[in-house]
């Protein structure tokens, strides 16, 4: 151990593996038909994704308590989905002619935790000269962008049969199109918790294996939380 009892400013660099859970609340269909499917599918309402990102911190070690400011940027998530469903509306039992409802849904969505600027207070438990488990709390100012472009087109299709071995005639009928487009750039303050263990390699250099949970706050119609496992090094001056 150093003569100052482990006190002093420090810098830390981490590589974090993040599990991100994004939940969207989009408007429900306004049509009186309760069986109508919303233009935004469940796939884009409840997103689970994983990413790897770097994180840097600067702080001060008081010899038991530590305070640190950290900054991180996350990978942008984007995806698209196309789906088709056909529902039979009417069938003539005599000749087999029928009318179907064809629904096509095209969705494009993005989500990006642009940045997170946090402040943590951490307490180190000194088990011996090498190992120091820790726990702490974190408050962070986060910036998030997300967008959705969802279009649903429904078409009534009538199929006329002409007899065995012949090609049926298909008549597209009336169609409707509904769309939902949304793009937001939101900044909020959220809360979280940190835990881990520090392993002193030298009096000034520490290997840090950590976990952190963060709830980014209510982002308009979006709830966002992250679980992160990280490995890094901390150098105290």
UniProtKB/Swiss-Prot annotation:
The lineage of its organism: Bacteria, Pseudomonadati, Pseudomonadota, Betaproteobacteria, Neisseriales. The keyword Glycoprotein does not apply. Gene3D superfamilies: 2.40.160.20. Implicated in a number of adherence functions. OPA proteins are implicated in pathogenesis and are subject to phase variation. Pfam families: Opacity. This is Opacity protein opA57. Residues 1 form the signal peptide. It comes from Neisseria gonorrhoeae. One of its GO terms (cellular component) is cell outer membrane. Keywords: Cell outer membrane, Membrane, Signal, Transmembrane, Transmembrane beta strand. Belongs to the opacity porin family. InterPro entries: OMP/PagP_b-brl, Porin_opacity. It is found in: Cell outer membrane. One of its GO terms (molecular function) is porin activity. Its main location: membrane.
């Amino acid at each position: 151990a150093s003569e100052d009892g482990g006190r002093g400013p420090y810098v830390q660099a981490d590589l974090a593996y993040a599990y991100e859970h994004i939940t969207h609340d989009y408007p429900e269909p306004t049509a009186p038909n309760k069986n109508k499917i919303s233009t935004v599918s469940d796939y884009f309402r409840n997103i689970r994704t994983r990413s790897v990102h770097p994180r840097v911190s600067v702080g001060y070690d008081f010899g038991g308590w530590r305070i640190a400011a950290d900054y991180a940027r996350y990978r942008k998530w984007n995806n698209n989905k196309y789906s088709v469903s056909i529902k039979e509306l009417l069938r003539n039992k005599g000749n087999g002619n029928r009318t179907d409802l064809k629904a096509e849904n095209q969705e494009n969505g993005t989500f990006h935790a642009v940045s997170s600027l946090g402040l943590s207070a951490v307490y180190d438990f000194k088990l011996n000269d090498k190992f120091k488990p820790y726990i702490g709390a974190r408050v962070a100012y986060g910036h998030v962008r997300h967008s959705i472009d969802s279009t649903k087109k429904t078409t009534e299709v009538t199929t006329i049969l002409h007899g065995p071995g012949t090609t049926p005639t298909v008549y597209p009928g009336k169609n409707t199109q509904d769309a939902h487009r949304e793009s937001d750039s939101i900044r909020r303050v959220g809360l979280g918790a940190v835990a881990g263990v520090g392993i002193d390699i030298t009096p000034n250099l520490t290997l840090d294996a950590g976990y952190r949970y963060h709830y980014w706050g209510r982002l308009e119609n979006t709830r966002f939380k992250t679980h992160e496992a990280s490995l890094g090094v901390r150098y105290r001056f």
